[in-house]
Amino acid sequence: MQITMGYLQENLRQQTLAGIFSTSQPTISRAINNVLNILDVVLPPPPQPVDLNPNRLYVLDGTLIPCWWWKNARNLYSGKHHRAGHNLQVLTDQAGEIFYISEPLPGSTHDITAIRSTGLFSYMQPWHCTADKGYVGLGCDTPFRKRPGKPLLDWQRRFNKGINQIRYVVERSIAHLKVWRILSTPSRLPQPTTIRAINVIRKIMFYQPPAEPYFPSN
């Protein structure tokens, strides 16, 4: 467990961890895989769109989780970010508390496509979400786009400024999420293990330990 948590938090090379724990790199690799498999099974699932309060006001943004670019997974490359990774959709309230993190999708997935795939707006109205220009057309509160040869009006600029002030909280929350360095620096794990690691962190972020130990009756 200590090895796996250290790996997720610091994204150290497995050879480095092998030196720290006086063992071999294959042993470190097996330990990480075994613990990730166990955590993925025993941790409760993270919140789903159906679990969210549809009357709450949210802030929505996407982020790229960088990873190694495997030749057999060309869809991981994000033209927007010019690197390979996985797309995560993050939903916070207007105070910045994270309420939802989507499953990872290939980095080439556009934010609109990614959020549609979650089914989020089957459970709430899109205007309950503030988002950036990448979500224009969904019905969310988004900034006005400047059209060629048509500068924004003063009230539109003020509106955009207000939207950006609201959106700041989700950007800050994503930065806090990426304290897990496996989410902010390219992972060297195989692609299936990388996805499993991301999903384990999603579960850890929402895990609430029982207030009291539970002992089933005979």
Named regions from a protein language model:
Residues M1-E10:
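Short, amphipathic alpha-helical "recognition" segments used to contact nucleic acids or chromatin
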Residues E10, Q14-N218:
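Short, well-ordered secondary-structure "scaffold" segments embedded in the functional core
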